[in-house]
A protein has these predicted regions:
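C-terminal TM-helix exit segments that contain a strictly Trp-centered aromatic cap at the helix terminus
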Residues: 55-63, 385-394
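Membrane-interfacial helix-loop connectors
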Residues: 127-143, 286, 325-387
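Mid-membrane cores of alpha-helical transmembrane segments in multi-pass membrane proteins
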Residues: 73-83, 101-107, 127-135, 154-159, ...
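Transmembrane alpha-helix/helix-exit interface in multi-pass inner-membrane proteins
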Residues: 60, 64-72, 277-293
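Short, amphipathic, aromatic/basic-enriched membrane-interface segments that mark the entry/exit
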Residues: 7-11, 91-98, 117-126, 311-319, ...
Length: 425
């Protein structure tokens, strides 16, 4: 058991190590020379770590922006945080071991299902699997399951989600990437496909966000990072002005608050640059290495990777998705109390990563107009679903808490429906 716990806590929860081991296995199965195996494995890990470093820079900048945004406009409500649910389930309920073992079980079930079903997707986003494991264990626990039955049920449900969600998104993914080499491993798939549906109904895919014609004086905006900067700097400065110097001083210290927020906007752009460099390095090594697994262990399988791998395909759509998902989430924030549900505060980080990815999906099937309309709808959607789950979590002891990723929310709904059908309620 100690060995298993060590593997789970130190390997399976370290996404860079998992991805590196997958690359190692793939290269070994292809009988590549030792130098190629070492190089490919290390570059895969390095690519993932560079991606993660960029993501961390973005998250740090957005955390400041999000806190000051709420203070600037006096917003109060629930903050959706699956991290909080994970922490309480381990400290108050003592479910840490069950969550860890279920995480390993989900990965095993995913591989088995990929082997025996037509859905050949290996889910490689370790952090997302941890959150799915948390929700599966928590809701299985409150359905009355304990010990081994809890772990088995949680593993099967989580493994099914890890297999089916990439399959659900793959028709649009093929259009976005122009190939069938990679899949999406991010538990916001219901939101992405909902956005794509709205975009397809309301948009025109022939007018892409990436084909905007600019006058010569604005041609510099064709540089992805400069165009992001032009959008984000005003966002940050407006929030700084409304929040005021006192609120900003907590983060800015002795630096002028306007200058500080200007630099934070540039920090965001820097993080995006690093993230995209990591994506390119990761895909250049992982996709060829994964062919070994595809050929030997799970024939025709595809790696399901985290959402930032899509950002280079439509960078303008990422920014539009972020902006209009944020607008939609603000609308949703005021709409939920009108529906008798708790008010959920918009999460800036989820708006960027999930909203940006939703923008790519929307643009692919609905162009610019579809991206705008679809992402506003997406913002409302990702406010309403967590608000619906919050009372259910309250019933089982998680007061004033809810989740962010909509697929984990759907997992909660699934368990509660099964509980009702079984008559345990």
């Amino acid at each position: 058991m100690q060995v298993l716990n060590f593997i789970i806590k130190n390997i399976l929860t370290q996404a860079s190590v998992v991805v590196g081991l997958i690359a190692l296995l793939g290269l070994v199965l292809q009988k590549k020379p030792i130098g190629t195996v070492v190089s490919g494995t290390m570059k895969t890990i390095l690519g993932f770590l560079v991606l993660s470093a960029g993501s961390s820079v973005i998250q740090g900048s957005l955390a400041i922006f999000g806190d000051l945004f709420n203070k600037a406009f006096g917003l109060k409500g629930l903050v959706a945080s699956i991290e909080g649910i994970n922490g309480q389930s381990m400290t108050d309920l003592g479910l840490g071991s069950e969550i860890a073992i279920t995480l390993a079980g989900i990965f095993i079930v995913n591989i088995i299902l990929a082997r025996i079903t037509p859905f050949k997707y290996i889910f490689l986003t370790g952090q997302a699997l941890l959150w799915e494991s948390t929700l599966c264990v928590v809701f299985a626990y409150f359905c009355g399951l304990r010990g081994l039955p809890l772990i088995i049920v949680g593993s099967i449900v989580g493994g099914a989600f890890a297999t089916l969600m990439p399959a659900f998104a793959q028709p649009v993914m093929r259009q976005i990437t122009g190939s069938d080499d990679i899949a999406l491993g991010h538990f916001c798939t219901f939101g992405y496909m909902f956005t794509a549906l709205i975009a397809k109904l309301t948009g025109d895919k022939s007018k892409s966000t990436e084909d905007v014609a600019l006058p010569k004086s604005l041609e510099f905006l064709q540089d992805t990072y400069l165009s992001v900067m032009v959008v984000m700097v005003p966002f940050y400065l407006i929030v700084a002005i409304f929040a005021g110097p006192k609120a900003c001083a907590e983060y800015a210290g002795a630096t002028n608050y306007i200058v500080f927020m200007f630099l934070q906007a540039l920090q965001f752009v820097t993080g995006l640059y690093v993230l995209m460099a990591g994506v390119r390095l990761l895909l250049a090594e992982l996709v060829p290495a994964f062919q070994g697994i595809s050929m030997k262990l799970v024939p025709n399988s595809k790696p399901a990777l985290d959402c930032p791998v899509l950002f280079p395909y439509a960078p303008n759509a990422v920014i539009l998705g972020f902006i209009f998902t944020t607008i939609g989430s603000i609308i949703g924030m005021f709409l939920t109390p009108m529906l008798g549900l708790p008010m959920i505060l918009p999460g800036v980080m989820s708006n960027f990563f999930a909203g940006g990815t939703a923008g790519i999906f929307a643009n692919q099937v609905g162009g610019r107009r579809g991206t705008i309309i679809g992402c506003i709808a997406h913002g409302i959607f990702i406010m309403i679903l967590p608000a619906l789950l919050s009372p259910m979590l309250g019933q089982i002891g998680f007061q004033n808490m809810t989740c962010t990723d909509v697929d984990t929310v759907v997992t909660g709904f699934f368990f509660m429906i099964i509980k009702s059908i079984a008559g345990i309620f």
